[in-house]
Amino acid sequence: VVKGPSCGEPVGESSHRPDLPFFTDYEKSKALADKIIDDYLDKGLEVMVARPTRVYGPGPLTEANSVTRLIKIYLKYRVSLILNQGHEIGNYVYVEDVAEGLELIMKKGRSGEDYILGGENVSLNKFYDMLEEVSGRKAIRLKISVPLALAVARLETAKARWLGFYPFITTSWVRTFLENWAFSHQKATAELGYK
């Protein structure tokens, strides 16, 4: 995430963030953590960084686990929520694959290196095609315009603040999903045996 969205080519560990603002506080916190890590590396501390992509699977249903929310909605209500036209690319990785990647980094990683722990680069449309195939369930494809998604996100955020729960959707989430986020985990595969 800290490397930013992909601009034509999958993002790798040596990629630099495009000249774009951070979409979420989560992204900002990762960038700040990188600066702290650099300071510790300069002091001789051994540090390896894991960079998971769009993780899904068991866990709290927060903004960071929004893909799992989409899967639950798909399975429960048989609805595919598609922002815009659903052509934007994301890199989806299962939480257990990330856990295995973390173990590999601890065993084989090199200090000062970062490793992208990713899965497949697919559009949201393709993601739902795969979900339909795996689950054996068809769902209605509900395409949501950007202005509508932003309006719903603002209302949801206000309601969540007032009632004290985590919002289902935020404006940051909407803006994030409007970009392409293709990543390459080639380095983790070559150096660590990550699959």
Please state what every model-predicted region is.
Residues 29:
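Active-site helix of classical SDR
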